[in-house]
Amino acid sequence: MSETLATDATAPAEKKDFIRQIVREDLASGKHTVIRTRFPPEPNGYLHIGHAKAICLDFGLAAEFGGLCNLRLDDTNPAKEDPEFVVAIQDDVRWLGYEWAQLRHASDYFQVYYLAAQKLIRDGHAFVCDLSAEQVRQYRGTLTEPGRNSPFRERSVEENLELFARMRAGEFPDGARTLRAKIDMASGNINLRDPALYRIKHVEHQNTGNAWPIYPMYDFAHSLGDAVEGITHSLCTLEFEDHRPLYDWCVDKVDLAGHPELLQPLLDKGLPREAAKPRQIEFSRLNINYTVMSKRKLTALVEEQLVDGWDDPRMYTLQGLRRRGYTPAAMRLFVDRVGISKQNSLIDFSVLEGCLREDLDAAAPRRMAVIDPLKLVLTNLPEGHTETLQFSNHPKDESFGTREVPFARELWIEREDFAEVPPKGWKRLVPGGEIRLRGAGIARVDEVIKNADGEIVELRGWLDPESRPGMEGANRKVKGTIHWVSAVHAVEAEIRLYDRLFSVEKPDDESEGKTYRDYLNPESKRNVRGYVEPSAAMAAPEQAFQFERSGYFVADRRDHSAATPVFNRSVTLRDTWAK
């Protein structure tokens, strides 16, 4: 993809978090003329809502300051990576409203990393170690005890170069040797106790095939990847704060900007020379109650078939949230509301739901749908009577226009809108009582039809002919208004009533001997058959609506069609979880 300025989908008011303050100071001082950021996911799973914060920050920051943001796929662990995830990651970033300046892969730089490792060996900063993984752990020490030097730490430069070349040639089995940095085994930061830079892994890579039997470790590849691309501000979450000294060590000891010969493999590929020294800045990760965001746990939910796949609308993956009906605008608004800081906090799930309601209240056309149907027959209308009524598509925005809604003698109404024995304060239908049928007139129930089991199967009533739209009688006051659909014209639809996947605020809490599996909400999904007005059935997949008085729904992106409509409840009209 050609290099273009990153573009944000919105133009928010100036934000004053600490990261933006750093960027403003760097630009004002002339330290940087253009800022460069990157979003560097590993393609070993689907992105989740936590990644949305990083995406919006990385791409949004670049857009805000007229800079560039790369999408770099950190594909240094081929055993866990899959092209399926590569495609999904790009889809998610674009869905959120962002475009990358360049699409890069860590594997694009494998030869650069190899040359950089050779430089570290020549400079006396790296050595080939024969200790096993278990022995390395024993030598590393603890938080209170220093580590011990590897017996192979003082190998000569020549021997290290030869052994590293043989590692590269594939002569040794997996785990036989590693290349380690030579830093300080007594450091109080365990990350600096001679960490591994390369490991042997005879695994085919999705981009490079079997060309490499050795692969760089994350800290080494990540820091040099930023340096190669000239990233000015490398943004990551707080758990990488202790890794920053190693990040800086790798950048400084290799010094790509000062050793352009190391970049020759990129120039040979036609890539530009952009190397510079990046700065790592950490911010708090996104934590939301009623969720789990561990990739391991999300994978288990899918593999154990506790959910219906990675894009199950109850999942916290971006694919799942999208299918649920969450919008890019709502996701960006949520990230803005949460803000950027160094303080870890737990965000209430209702904040996310509130952002979706706020967006859809303004953006979603209104439609009528009946989820639990009960027939109402208006007996004073002629048999076969039908007519067409004009309805506004949005009560707050005339630009949405109007639509035609069929009306008939036989209607479907919500079963819960009728009570044979009403509770105190009831404002809907009762025997002999009146109700306003949305946009159609005032109706009364005269007769309740039941089956042999005593269940109500039909209501029979009367429509006041003087209360039709535009008539004086339409202004007569009645206690309540209900929605309806024409039984003759309505289209049967599958309606999936989704709710939160977990029933407790902290499903990760295992203090009582339970796991997140024990806290799955049995009411998180209910499939029902209902009826929608014809114009809703004709919607394109991913079209959102407010089903009046019911909630916000979206036409399922996978299963919906005009012939077999499927709607997912995105969020209720009001917070039903409020305490």
UniProtKB/Swiss-Prot annotation:
Keywords: Aminoacyl-tRNA synthetase, ATP-binding, Cytoplasm, Ligase, Nucleotide-binding, Protein biosynthesis. A motif ('HIGH' region) lies at residues 41-51. SUPFAM superfamilies: Nucleotidylyl transferase, Ribosomal protein L25-like. It is found in: Cytoplasm. It catalyses: tRNA(Gln) + L-glutamine + ATP = L-glutaminyl-tRNA(Gln) + AMP + diphosphate. It is an enzyme of class 6 (ligase). ATP binds at residues 42-44, 48-54, 237, 285-286, 293-295. GO terms for biological process: glutaminyl-tRNA aminoacylation; glutamyl-tRNA aminoacylation. One of its GO terms (cellular component) is cytosol. Its EC number is 6.1.1.18. Belongs to the class-I aminoacyl-tRNA synthetase family. Monomer. This is Glutamine--tRNA ligase. It comes from Xanthomonas euvesicatoria pv. vesicatoria (strain 85-10).
